[in-house]
UniProtKB/Swiss-Prot annotation:
It catalyses: Endonucleolytic cleavage to 5'-phosphomonoester. The gene is rnhA. Binds 1 Mg(2+) ion per subunit. May bind a second metal ion at a regulatory site, or after substrate binding. One of its GO terms (cellular component) is cytoplasm. Its cofactor is Mg(2+). Residues 1-142 form the RNase H type-1 domain. It comes from Caldicellulosiruptor saccharolyticus (strain ATCC 43494 / DSM 8903 / Tp8T 6331). Its EC number is 3.1.26.4. This is Ribonuclease H. It is found in: Cytoplasm. Endonuclease that specifically degrades the RNA of RNA-DNA hybrids. Gene3D superfamilies: Ribonuclease H-like superfamily/Ribonuclease H. One of its GO terms (molecular function) is nucleic acid binding. Belongs to the RNase H family. Disulfide bonds: none annotated.
Length: 145
């Protein structure tokens, strides 16, 4: 099984507002940058979108390590919030509807195909690829305005 690393980040101006996302895929040292923009969105949607688009770009099942600065996503997966949400008919522990259900469900489909591990990185710190993702995601907002 091929091993791929994906760095991701999402950004949003005004939250909600215009947003951008970036995913950097790395396979055997070769980098591929994916990026996108949405007119009216939230930061969490852009974080999820970056991961989904990164996984969507893979042409076959892979072993993937996703690096993200989103504690929301890492905790939802690694602490199995997502499993609890599904059991509770997509309700949080406070009985509120989970936000971004459409994207969580799409992500779950890719998690069935790929063996994915999520790692939290500190945002706006010393991680070069995370910083690059952040810059690209933010630049998408500026470019598309």
């Amino acid at each position: 099984m091929k091993e791929v690393v994906i760095y991701t980040d999402g950004a949003c101006s005004k939250n909600p507002g215009p947003g951008g996302w970036c995913a950097i895929l790395i396979y055997k040292g070769i980098k591929k940058v994916l990026k996108g923009f949405e007119e009216n969105t939230t930061n969490n949607r852009m974080e999820l979108k970056a991961i989904i688009e990164g996984l969507k770009a893979l042409k076959e099942p892979c072993k993937v390590t996703v690096y993200t600065d989103s504690a929301y996503i890492v905790n939802a997966i690694n602490q199995n919030w997502i499993g609890k949400w599904q059991k509770n008919n997509w309700k949080t522990s406070e009985k509120e509807e989970v936000k971004n259900i459409d994207l969580w469900q799409e992500l779950l489909e890719f998690l069935k195909v790929h063996n994915v591990k999520f790692e939290k990185v500190k945002g706006h710190s010393t991680d070069t690829l995370n910083n690059m993702c952040d810059e690209i995601a933010r630049s998408m907002i500026k470019e598309m305005r």
